[in-house]
Amino acid sequence: MKVVTFGEIMLRLGAPDYLRLNQCNQFDISFAGAEANVAVSLANYGVKAEYITRLPKHPIADKCISELLSYRVDVSRVIRGGKRIGILYLETGSNMRSSCVYYDREDSSFATIGEHEIDWEEVLKEADWFHWTGITPALSESTYKACLRACLLYTS
């Protein structure tokens, strides 16, 4: 079985030690994205998982790709382009204070993906399942068009 996932992965900057964002002088870094998480989980279960996204050409995006590769996720068709990776800021809750997440993803590499940047016919040729979430087409007009194109090809 092979599953293709499509969506945005973001740099997650977390305030350490239950601090609030306005109290910290450094961040814990990791990466987050629903579709990437699904690909990692599937790969951990031994399912062939390919992740499709668009990331800028810089060392932070390289680190992101390395993380996915460490879980045996196929990232061979990740598109490199755009200017920035989307960012989410995390305050982990403590006691009665709940966690808070703040998103900064406007004009990210993924949000500005071109409708025809992905060769969906080739990507989906051997896919048994195509996974995306509702946020993917909601991010921008171009992610909507790219996702719609993939869905139309996958169901035909």
Predicted segments, located by residue:
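Conserved small/polar residues in nucleotide/adenosyl-binding loops
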Residues: 154-155
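Charged helix-capping and loop-helix junction motifs
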Residues: 144-149
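Glycine-rich phosphate/adenosyl-contacting loop at the front of the ribokinase-like
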Residues: 1-73, 113-116
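A short secondary-structure junction signal
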Residues: 114-115, 141-143
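Conserved N-terminal subdomain of the carbohydrate kinase-like
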Residues: 48-135
